[in-house]
Amino acid sequence: MALAAEAVVPPTTGSAAPIVRITALRKSYGSNEVLKGIDLDVRRGEVIAIIGKSGSGKSTLLRCINGLEEFQDGSLSVDGKPLLHDSAMAMRELRQRVGMIFQSFNLFPHLTVGRNVMLAPTLVKKRRAAEAASQARRLLERVGLAEKFDAMPEQLSGGQQQRVAIARALAMEPAVLLCDEITSALDPELVGEVLRVVESLAVEGMTLLMVTHEMSFARKVSDRVIFMHQGRVHEMGPPTSLFGDPQTPELKQFLSSLHD
């Protein structure tokens, strides 16, 4: 296996430690090993797209970073703090630093849009209702839904619901935002409105790791693209190199299959 990362990924320099550091990470479900020794450093403000076939371990990697999945070997730290599954306090701190947006929107149907965005800051960060409401209004404006504060989720399109989910994740002021195929459940005409919001976050300097099938989007906004294959980081590099000059047969075949 040829790992392109060695040649094309600039090392972290100076005192800027990586905001996410993953070392020799292994994750199994029973006898099925789905992550087979992942090594990855993510710099603050970096945008990384993760691509690959279904079952290659992409979503599992994100769920490990967020603490939703427990790994068997290796280490993972966020902002210098190790992920410790046996420490409830460490896990709470991690989840305040790492936001995650899923394929399904998972909005609370009985709460208004504004209340959905306010919920975590009031419960977890103990913010006053007025302060949380003000923040929710700002975030809804940021994702283009300022007028939907009092609407119910059922009144929104899928694209609008996913933008509310983005606002909800941002309400916890995460240092890192994980996006797990967040457009895959949307009708094609709604994908663009969600991707525009994600692109604006990238421009503003949010650290983003996103599993995506939107290759043109990955090429446009990413600093690095990771191609995962059979539980490993198979190739990694800038989008121009990875898409324009794939080094392994597996990546060449994957990219070719997208155009069949």
Q: Where on the chain are the PLM-derived regions?
A:
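ABC-family P-loop ATPase nucleotide-binding domain
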Residues: 1-26
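C-terminal boundary and immediately downstream tail of ABC-type ATPase nucleotide-binding domains
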Residues: 2-5, 229-230, 236, 240-260
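ABC family nucleotide-binding domain
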Residues: 17-239
